[in-house]
């Protein structure tokens, strides 16, 4: 309910069913579900119990609605454990397995596929491309230590999560302009991939609002589609989006032309 993009919120059973059916019909390859917003600029922290309840209830409904793989967006080990007990396929950790010390053990036990985001608990002051590569390498080392092969891992450069300041513990602090950081990363996706699949999430995000001077995320569709197309042309393998049909059509058209 705290998500920055209000149209993506589905609380009731019927709204979840409708949202999942719509995404599947529009061509989604998997469903990503979260129980707590981690947007750096919002005060959205909820208890582990609340996050877990939301995730468990949503996953059960989604599993009854579709056979698509399910990704759970959490950095809490206890929440991941409950989701994996239900048969969830993917854990999407915005902190790259670095926030909760118990997360690697849960990952080792259940052996899921992983989406690992670039993240540091310490401030990043150096070259953003090199630093992002290093953060990826550290997360890959953690995954390797619990016997998760690279073939089960996708990397995410955490667009929107590198900031000078924030209101939670899920972002990486930097001493430079966050919009410039995000644009630099998106311009140079191939240079940070480490020969790994790369997932990019730019849908309706703040940097688009900054570029277009559109404060309301719901007004950022055109900017989102442009950014998503460029991401794919620049080397992204997976796009996490709120707008499945529009995104697929834009990317399909761009790939044919390019």
PLM feature spans:
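Short acidic capping loops at alpha-helix termini that bridge into adjacent secondary structure
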Residues: 149-152
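Active-site loop-to-helix "anion-binding N-cap" substructures in soluble metabolic enzymes
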Residues: 28-30, 74, 106
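Active-site-adjacent loop and "lid" segments of alpha/beta metabolic enzymes
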Residues: 3-22, 38-57, 61, 77, ...
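Catalytic domains of carbohydrate-active enzymes, especially glycoside hydrolases
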Residues: 18-34
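His-Asp phosphorelay/catalytic-motif detector in bacterial-type signaling
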Residues: 66-67
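Acidic/histidine-rich, metal-coordinating catalytic segments
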Residues: 158
């Amino acid at each position: 309910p705290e998500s920055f993009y209000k149209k993506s919120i589905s609380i009731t059973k019927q709204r979840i069913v409708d949202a999942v059916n719509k995404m599947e019909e529009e061509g989604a390859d998997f469903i990503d579900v979260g129980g707590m917003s981690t947007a750096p600029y919002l005060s959205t922290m909820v208890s582990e119990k609340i996050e877990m309840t939301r995730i468990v209830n949503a996953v059960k409904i989604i599993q009854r609605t579709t056979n698509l793989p399910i990704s759970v967006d959490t950095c809490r080990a206890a929440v991941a454990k409950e989701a994996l007990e239900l048969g969830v396929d993917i854990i999407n950790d915005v902190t790259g397995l670095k926030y909760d010390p118990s997360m690697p053990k849960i990952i080792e036990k259940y052996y899921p596929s992983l989406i690992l985001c670039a993240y540091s608990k310490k401030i990043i002051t150096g070259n953003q491309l090199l630093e992002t590569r290093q953060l990826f390498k550290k997360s890959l080392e953690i995954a390797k230590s619990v016997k998760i092969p690279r073939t089960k891992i996708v990397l995410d450069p955490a667009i929107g999560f590198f900031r000078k300041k924030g209101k939670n513990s899920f972002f990486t602090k930097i001493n430079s302009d966050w919009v410039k950081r995000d644009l630099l990363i998106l311009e140079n996706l191939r240079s940070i991939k480490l020969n790994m699949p790369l997932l990019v999430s730019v849908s309706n995000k703040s940097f688009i609002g900054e570029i277009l001077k559109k404060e309301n995320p719901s007004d950022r569709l055109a900017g989102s589609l442009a950014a998503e197309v460029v991401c794919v042309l620049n080397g992204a393998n997976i796009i996490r989006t709120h707008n499945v049909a529009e995104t697929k059509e834009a990317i399909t058209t761009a790939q044919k032309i390019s």
